[in-house]
């Protein structure tokens, strides 16, 4: 495989920024931020129903609670009360038709991602709407299953850390406890990296190798961690959101956070495509593997 020089990598980085702007990535990030907020609660309702059916309700609640604790408090303040209500138990009167509606709404976010990623990868002829929508629902179901399995793994590690002293009859020093907490953080980052890579790999209507999507996924995860840290500092020291929007400040802060995170996600896809072009590789559309996707 061709090796890229640091200058070529910087060129790919810059071209990805340019393409993100040219492909309306800034505007699409706002669209995805809205879909993220719109699909969040239906997805949680559906996922709670699934983990309840599997008998893992407490595991799911512990996992979602740990995620809420990891996110900036100003962002989750407006969302947390309803999220806590949902993970405490499915809404009363939840019918089959409601589950179907939740799946449809949550899959809209997947469909939005597909549209944007197809544009980033220059897909000339996307599939028919019914096929795209069917794929979105199927991929949502697969993503839900993988998320549940990831919940079990992460929560199992948390349980191990909290009970290691009782199980093994040993006392952990503060250094050992810090090491185990860092290990849990790295596991969470690893799960996040695999999740982003899987989205880049599975959702766009192209055939590609999994390894080719990992550079952009790595940039996205690092970018998200940096944004979460900087956004927390901003809200703590420059509380303009609450001053301007009042009681709506929490919702607006969440939308802004999702907006920036989605912009980074779109940039990661553009960066992957620039790397593919720099390496002289070609990607092929799934519905017609005999033709290469035209590049621009």
Per-segment meaning from a language model:
Residues 1-296:
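Membrane-embedded alpha-helices and immediately adjacent juxtamembrane helical segments
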């Amino acid at each position: 495989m061709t090796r890229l020089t640091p200058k070529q990598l910087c060129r790919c980085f810059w071209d990805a920024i340019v393409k993100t702007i040219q492909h309306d990535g800034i505007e699409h990030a706002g669209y995805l931020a809205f879909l993220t907020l719109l699909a969040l609660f239906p997805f949680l309702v559906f996922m709670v129903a699934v983990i309840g059916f599997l008998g893992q309700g407490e595991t799911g609640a512990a996992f979602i609670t740990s995620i809420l604790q990891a996110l900036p408090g100003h962002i989750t303040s407006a969302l947390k009360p309803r999220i806590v209500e949902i993970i405490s138990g499915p809404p009363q009167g939840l019918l089959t038709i409601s589950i179907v509606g939740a799946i449809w709404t949550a899959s809209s976010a997947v469909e939005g991602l597909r549209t944007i990623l197809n544009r980033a990868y220059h897909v000339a002829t996307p599939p028919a709407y019914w096929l795209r929508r069917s794929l979105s629902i199927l991929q949502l179901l697969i993503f839900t299953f993988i998320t549940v399995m990831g919940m079990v793994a992460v929560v199992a590690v948390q349980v191990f850390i909290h009970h290691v002293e009782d199980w093994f009859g040993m006392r952990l020093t503060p250094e050992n406890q810090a090491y185990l907490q860092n290990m849990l953080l790295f596991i969470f980052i690893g799960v996040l990296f695999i999740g982003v890579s899987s989205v880049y790999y599975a959702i766009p209507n192209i055939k590609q190798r999994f390894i080719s999507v990992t550079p952009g996924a790595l940039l996205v995860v690092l970018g998200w961690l940096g944004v979460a840290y900087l956004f927390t500092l901003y809200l703590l020291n420059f509380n303009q959101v609450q001053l301007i929007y009042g009681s709506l400040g929490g919702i607006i802060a969440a939308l802004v956070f999702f907006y920036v995170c989605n912009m980074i996600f779109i940039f990661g896809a553009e960066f992957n495509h620039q790397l593919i072009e720099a390496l002289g590789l070609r990607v092929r559309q799934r519905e017609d593997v005999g033709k290469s996707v035209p590049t621009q």
